[in-house]
Amino acid sequence: MPDPSSTPNRTREIESRSRIISERICESVRLLDNEPSLALYRLQEHTVRSLPGLVNRRIMLTQQSATLSGAQFDLENTLSTTTSMQNATSAFDNCIELLRNCMFYKQQLDFDSTRKATSSAESSTVKGRSKSLHNVATRVHSTEASTSNDA
């Protein structure tokens, strides 16, 4: 059986030894923690863990950048097209006015041709000659006849 008087001494001795051991362990841990080769090992470990995720994100970012560049090109092209169309409204208005004039002139020509056709059908014409030439020939003959009658 242990001696009751030696128990407090033993407890002090154990406490002092445990304190010394814990200080040495803490110092060893600090040294290991600050050792350069261990730090490099931890960096390599971190890099190996995080690099595949970074590479995947970079690939996704590159793909999204290409998609956004295409969308930006399409938007700029659309904006320039709409701006050009807005600037061309005066040209379109001018074309519409010219088309209206053409339709009006065509209607006038059709009306004149139908009027001439109906008037020529009603009046007598000399075959092979136009009405205007027949009228000129008639006038020439009538003036010759009137001058010969006067003489």
From Swiss-Prot:
Region Disordered, residue ranges: 116-151
InterPro entries reported in the protein's UniProt record: BORCS8
Similarity remark: Belongs to the BORCS8 family.
Keyword terms of this UniProt record: Lysosome, Membrane
Cell location: Lysosome membrane
One cellular-component annotation, GO: lysosomal membrane
Upper lineage: Eukaryota, Metazoa, Ecdysozoa, Nematoda, Chromadorea
Segments of skewed composition (Polar residues): 116-127
Name of the protein described by the UniProt record: BLOC-1-related complex subunit 8 homolog
Function comment: May participate in the coupling of lysosomes to microtubule plus-end-directed kinesin motor.
Pfam family, any one: BORCS8
Domain of life: Eukaryota
